[in-house]
Amino acid sequence: MSKLHFQPIKGQAREILTAILESPEVASCKEEEIQVLRLACEEIIMNVTSYAYPEDADGFLDVDIQKTDRMTIRFEDGGAPFNPLEQEKPDTGLSWEKRRIGGLGIFLLRRKMDDVRYAYVDHKNILTIEKKI
């Protein structure tokens, strides 16, 4: 199990994603699995680094990665409470010009992962994703 801690996180999205993808758990996956995990992790990281904390706050992001018969990645931040799973799903039947901005990344995340869970515990957002591998 890999435990990663990042602080500060502002402007560090690429470094955070690279560290996750280079973890022994993720790096040992098949290329197709890595690409799906990359998409999911990138969406979560961008949301946390862009929106979780006020502009002048450093903030932190903890990431726990565990590989068994499934990959489990747990993201924990101390930002404002935000459950991405409660957001309105985008209307994918509309053309992109008519579709409202936002929500497509989380929509894709939910479609690509086998399980996505959110909890707010002890003033922390905890988002866990799982993918059978």
Language-model-derived ranges and their functions:
Residues 1-3, 49-133:
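Conserved beta-strand-loop-beta-strand hairpin that lines the nucleotide-binding pocket
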Residues 2-31:
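Helix-loop-beta hinge of the Bergerat
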Residues 20-42, 46, 98-100:
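Conserved short strand/loop->alpha-helix "switch" segment adjacent to the catalytic nucleotide/phosphoryl-transfer site
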